[in-house]
Amino acid sequence: MFNDRPQTDRMFFPPERPEVTSELSNNVVLTTLNDLYNWARLSSVWPLMYGTACCFIEFAGLIGSRFDFDRFGLVPRASPRQADLIITAGTITMKFAPALVTLYQQMPEPKYVIAMGACTITGGMFSTDSPTTVRGVDKLIPVDVYIPGCPPRPEAIFDAIIKLRKKMATEDFRERYDTIAQTHRYYTAAHRMKAVADPLTSEYIRLESRQAAPPALAAAIEMGIPLDLQRTPQLEEQIRDGEHRDARA
């Protein structure tokens, strides 16, 4: 048998450092594991097909040939277990909040969230008197990029995707799990909603501020303006007394 031990030793333990030729230096890229990992994810962001209101119509417009979001490597997925991006397009209600948190928890790491539209970010036009709207999706799940608007244009979604890719390019995959932990969130899938009294009642008509005009207006017209739209028992009695006096006269 041939003795290949000397040749094997020279292969594994060369006497001198091999030189890198010019042809090899032009075809080899030196990088780090982080950069390689992030580079592979930049062009393979898979969003979850998720929408609750009118903002999703703008997101659905990206699928057409006019915008063609496939050139960004976006592949819409119907299952959260195959997606790494969720775009919350639309209003989030208290009843749907547990489902959203469950979808987020089912997505594999690393995962990202884009809050799209005013209703998702602050509650939008439902933020003042709606007892069922969540005032900001970031109270439920961590958000990476916000897209203001009502609704935002498809170009704004592309801008958010570009900003998200820039954020992904500078991440260290060993640190992300610690920075976005759910420890600072007060909501979980097992959270019990606290019942809130209905603010839409007729009692506001009887408030003191609704019974008379503002002082500045009353002083300007030199009279009080009752704003009560319902007749009180005292007013009904005064009206009846006046009708009796008119009948006697």
Swiss-Prot record:
PROSITE patterns per UniProt: COMPLEX1_20K
Coiled-coil ranges from the UniProt annotation: none
EC number(s) per entry: 7.1.1.-
Cofactor comment text: Binds 1 [4Fe-4S] cluster.
One Pfam family per UniProt: Oxidored_q6
One GO location term (cellular component): plasma membrane
Keyword Protein transport: no
InterPro entries, per database record: NADH_UbQ_OxRdtase-like_20kDa, NADH_UQ_OxRdtase_20Kd_su
Annotated binding of [4Fe-4S] cluster, by residue: 54-55, 119, 150
SUPFAM superfamilies attached to this UniProt entry: HydA/Nqo6-like (SSF56770)
Membrane topology: Peripheral membrane protein
Complexes and interactors: NDH-1 can be composed of about 15 different subunits; different subcomplexes with different compositions have been identified which probably have different functions.
PANTHER family, alphabetized: NADH DEHYDROGENASE, NADH DEHYDROGENASE [UBIQUINONE] IRON-SULFUR PROTEIN 7, MITOCHONDRIAL
NCBIfam families documented for this protein: nuoB_fam, PRK06411.1
Name the UniProt record assigns to this protein: NAD(P)H-quinone oxidoreductase subunit K 2
Biological source species: Gloeobacter violaceus (strain ATCC 29082 / PCC 7421)
Lineage, broadest ranks: Bacteria, Bacillati, Cyanobacteriota, Cyanophyceae, Gloeobacterales
